Regions:
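N-terminal Rossmann-fold NAD(P) dinucleotide-binding loop
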Residues: 10-11
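Redox-cofactor binding/interface segments in oxidoreductases and associated redox assembly factors
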Residues: 4, 144-145, 268
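Short phosphate-binding/catalytic loops that engage adenosine nucleotides
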Residues: 22, 55, 107
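C-terminal helical "tail/cap" subdomain of flavin- and related membrane-associated enzymes
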Residues: 296-365
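Predominantly flavin-linked oxidoreductase catalytic cores and closely associated redox partners
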Residues: 101-234
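A conserved beta-strand/loop capping segment in the N-terminal third of enzymes
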Residues: 47-99
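Glycine-rich FAD pyrophosphate-binding loop
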Residues: 2-6, 15-38
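FAD/FMN-dependent oxidoreductases across multiple families
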Residues: 215-294, 305
Length: 365
């Protein structure tokens, strides 16, 4: 069995599947440890699952997050208690921890390696995979955990790949004066910025911005000063924080178009199956849950068709609506008028805000 991509979905799937007796090889284009653009807030819906499977990194002191702060583009904010809450942890630490566990438990890793071509051979009922190191593999099952956007999406001719997206993602780690129990979402014209505590007293500062604004101002730093700093709360964070990296992690072409959980017999996991808007704060939990779903499908399905149908059905029942709600409410964020409406809803009709949160999150599993 081959897993393409070593993010949360791929790593957790490898750990679950090797425990079930599968021989698992995982291909990852980078070499651990490394940073990823990610909000680094994990919903507590995964807490029981992680502890039950001995995957929770209890050697780290992680901040417990139970409050949501929302500010509009003018910097006026409102707070809302979170029913489930969550915790903050960097992908640098979490991915490294899961990678080390998987290596110890027998997962074979091909790091610094990419898949250059992938075809399903109907007659042989096998996948043929070509790797960047010129290896050619033939395997019966391939899991696609290659993230938001990959060259494999182009190889598979997935429809979203040809649609340009205006969104960019930018992430920093900082030292700052902030509340460790609060995850904040600060709006600015054209996007929004998440801010929450992670391990070792650090904070994650990660925002979804607009490519056109970056072009207009010529650099990330100038765009931040001209656009993000118009929200006084963001201006204060940027001015008063100690930035721990020389330059941020940046990704482009972040696309929230619908995707399918199964493409040409590939079982898609995490962001490769569907990317939830970051404002929902649920991508990391969904990645881990999809790993569990695919493990259950492979256990219970007797044929390829049964596995694919089982996985598609369960994936859609749990995530399809969640992704749709995220896309629908995205318009309330990153605009002056929309963010004021959202702030007023949270402040004066908290029931609506809680309903939206419930519809973008799942139950503990």
């Amino acid at each position: 069995m081959l897993i393409v991509g070593g993010g949360l979905a791929g790593l957790v799937a490898s750990l679950l599947l090797v425990k079930e007796g599968h021989a698992v090889t995982l291909v990852e284009k980078k070499v651990y440890p490394f940073h990823r653009v990610c909000g680094e807030y994990v919903s507590n819906e995964v807490l029981d699952f992680l502890k039950r499977n001995n995957l929770y990194p209890d050697f780290l002191e992680l901040p417990h997050i139970d409050t949501f702060e929302f500010s509009d583009t003018q910097g006026k904010s409102v707070f809302l208690p979170l029913d489930l809450g969550g915790f903050g942890i960097s992908r640098y630490q979490l991915d490294l921890w899961l990678y080390q566990l998987a290596s110890e438990q027998g997962v074979k890793f091909l790091t610094g390696t990419t898949v250059t071509d992938l075809v399903f051979l109907e007659k042989e009922d096998l996948f043929q995979i070509k790797l960047s190191d010129f290896q050619v593999l033939q395997v019966p099952v391939v899991l696609g955990a290659f993230g938001k956007r990959s060259k494999l999406d182009q190889v598979l001719e997935r429809p979203f790949f040809t649609k340009r997206s205006p969104y960019i993602g930018v992430k920093y780690h900082v030292l700052a004066e902030g509340s460790p129990n609060t995850v904040a979402l600060h709006n600015f014209q054209g996007g929004y910025c998440g801010f929450n505590a992670i391990e070792e007293g650090k904070f994650n500062l990660c925002y979804l911005g607009n490519r056109d604004q970056l072009r207009q101002y010529g650099s990330i730093e100038e765009m931040e000063r001209a656009v993000l700093w118009k929200n006084p709360l963001l201006k204060r964070i940027f001015e008063e924080s100690t930035f721990l990296w020389e330059k941020p992690e940046v990704i482009t072409e972040i696309n929230f178009e619908r995707k399918k959980p199964v493409e040409n017999h590939l079982l898609m996991l995490g962001d490769a199956a569907g990317l939830i808007t970051p404002l929902c704060g649920n991508g990391m939990a969904m990645a881990m849950h999809s790993a569990l779903l695919v493990t259950e499908a492979l256990r219970e399905g007797k044929t390829r068709q049964e596995v694919e149908q089982h996985y598609s059905r369960r994936w859609n029942s749990l995530f399809y609506q969640r992704l749709g709600v995220g896309r629908a409410i995205q318009g309330l964020f990153g605009s002056g008028r929309g963010s004021v409406i959202a702030r007023n809803l949270i402040a004066h009709v908290p029931f609506v805000a809680r309903t939206l949160l419930k519809n973008t999150h799942g139950q503990p599993f």
